[in-house]
Amino acid sequence: MLIGRVVGNLVATQKYAKLEGTRLLLVQPLDLAGKDRGTTILAIDGVDAGPGDRVLVVQDGRAAQLVLGKGTSAVDAAVVGVVDAVDLQG
């Protein structure tokens, strides 16, 4: 899993049938300090996240499929939560 920020969405008028009705988000991975790290990833939105939201992303394909209830569909990453706060102090 990783924490990221939604930086945009991707519109696909044609896509795999099992992905019909899903939203595709562009997510910028963040480090624990909230700084950008790595390259932007594409993830299916499972929680109705929006631009600027900090989100929790699962990148294991099988886990993403299970969380979204998409069975054997071609899912690589999924947004599974909106992050309210990160507490590094414990």
Regions found by a protein language model. Give the residues of each.
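C-terminal structural segments of small proteins and small subunits
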Residues: 56-90
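Short alpha-helix capping/helix-loop boundary micro-motifs
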Residues: 39-44
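Short, flexible, glycine/charge-rich loop motifs used to bind or transfer phosphoryl groups or to couple energy/partner
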Residues: 15, 45, 69
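Pocket-edge structural micro-motifs
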Residues: 28-29, 45, 59
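N-terminal first-folded block
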Residues: 1-35
